[in-house]
Amino acid sequence: MNISSRIKKNLAFYLLAAVFAFAPLCNADAQSDDNEFGIWTTLEASKKINKKLKLDFEAELRTIEGVGDIERVSLGAGASYKFTKWLKASAGYIFIYSHSLEEKKPKTDDPLIIDGIGTFYDYNVDHAYWTERHRFHLSLTGEYKIGRVELSLRERLQYTRTNSAVTDESKYRWHQQFDADFNEIEPTLELKETAPELKETKYNTTLRSRLTAKWDIAKCKVTPFASVELYTRLDDWKGCDKMRYRIGASYKINKDNSVSLFYMYQDANDDDEPKGHAIGLGYSIDL
């Protein structure tokens, strides 16, 4: 092995190590900034029908709060068609079984204010529940190579239906208390009631614009990559809803098998995922 090849392979190793090193840092940052941290694991399989047409299958499991809770499980299938060397189109369907964690919702109106003691807000608690989502997507991807760097821009239009679900809502209320001399003291918190709550069906149409850069290192099985993705909701236009950033690398085991590792940060909450960080692990196979 010559010096140049050794440098390239060492560089690839350090890039992978850097992604691993992000994990504990991300978790600490997530806890301090009220962001979430999770692990995303993906299994992908593809079958080439001919030079232009390919079928794709995907299964994914995501956790939240580290590995404490499952956030969602999904299964997807799709197809892509390559028009030219640099342009392809794809379409697919994803079934998502999503877990909404328990949520505390403070009531900011009419708080109980006690001088010298504090301000106390009533609140409601939505209990955890599962719901089904059906997602359809259409994509157009263009690719362009600059030396050993491949740039790609994917524009994806996705439509998501989130089915209705029933959960329980608990209402907690503060009650004013007095001592024997009728002085206000620490109030007591009581559960007023727990009743079923209907989460109505939701519809979401979003445009996702993702720019990706891959570095093809000569004579090396590791391919570093980075991407930035912009989400724009079309049925409730407010400009850019969120940004998602990824950095990672893939490793080609052999002709048909590869694994990948990445770090992801998302800068805003939405109906799909919470704001926060994730470490992703993936396995891909060509059938």
What spans do the regions from the language model cover?
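Repeated loop/turn-to-beta-strand initiation elements of outer-membrane beta-barrel proteins
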Residues: K52-F57, W86-A91, G147-L151, K219-T223, ...
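Residues that define the transmembrane beta-barrel architecture of outer-membrane proteins
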Residues: F37-I39, E71-V73, E132-F136, T201-L207, ...
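Predominantly the C-terminal beta-signal and adjacent terminal strand-loop region
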Residues: A226, C240-L287
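Outer-membrane beta-barrel translocator/channel fold
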Residues: I64-G66, I70-E71, W86, S90-S170, ...
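Residues on the lipid-exposed face of transmembrane beta-strands in outer-membrane beta-barrel proteins
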Residues: T41-K47, A77-Y81, L138-G142, L157, ...
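Outer-membrane beta-barrel domain signature
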Residues: D29-D34, T63-G68, V125-T131, P196-K202, ...
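Bacterial Sec-dependent N-terminal signal peptides
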Residues: M1-D33, L287
